[in-house]
């Protein structure tokens, strides 16, 4: 299943972000966790109706999400924009906060680069692309 995230009406392909990172090997930057802009009360987990704080307050009720936080592999950098918004790595971020860590590594993408990962501008993150469409999209945005 394709891995996407959304900000406003823009839906971004996290899979394309991983491909970009693996092919072009940008440097990860050490950042202060306080520079990350994440609302722990924002609804968006599960079916979009629970928050991180809901999960942390009710770990038995939200066992799957709670386990994902605890099992998050901290060796992978977070992917974020220049404003501190996370595009991939929320579970890692939450785990780092719970461990009282102060810093982590992050790939920081500016708006120009992030625009290349947009796969939908209608806010419909259920729209699926076929594998050939992802390959063509990557080629058009990064190779041509």
Placement of each model-derived feature along the sequence:
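Glycine-rich short-loop/terminal segments
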Residues: 1-52
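Short alpha-helix boundary/capping and kink motifs at helix termini
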Residues: 34-87
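Amphipathic, charge-rich alpha-helical segments that serve as recognition/docking helices
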Residues: 54, 58, 112-144
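Short loop/turn motifs at secondary-structure junctions
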Residues: 74, 100-102
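Residue-level "edge-of-site" marker
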Residues: 82, 109-110
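A sequence-level detector for short glycine-anchored, His/Arg-bearing signature motifs
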Residues: 83-99
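Short hydrophobic/aromatic-enriched beta-strand-loop microsegments
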Residues: 102-109
């Amino acid at each position: 299943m394709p891995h996407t995230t959304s900000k406003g009406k823009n839906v971004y392909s996290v899979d394309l972000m991983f491909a970009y990172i693996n092919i072009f090997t940008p440097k990860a930057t050490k950042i202060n966790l306080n520079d990350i802009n994440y609302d722990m009360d924002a609804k968006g987990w599960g079916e979009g109706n629970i928050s991180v704080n809901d999960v942390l307050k009710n770990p038995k009720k939200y066992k799957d999400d709670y386990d994902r936080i605890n099992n998050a592999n901290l060796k992978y950098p977070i992917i974020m924009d220049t404003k501190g918004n996370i595009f991939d790595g929320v579970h890692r971020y939450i785990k780092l906060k719970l461990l009282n860590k102060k810093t982590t590594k992050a790939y920081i993408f500016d708006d120009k680069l992030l625009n290349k990962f947009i796969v939908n501008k209608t806010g419909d993150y259920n729209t699926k692309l076929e594998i050939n469409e992802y390959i063509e999209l990557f080629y058009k945005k990064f190779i041509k």
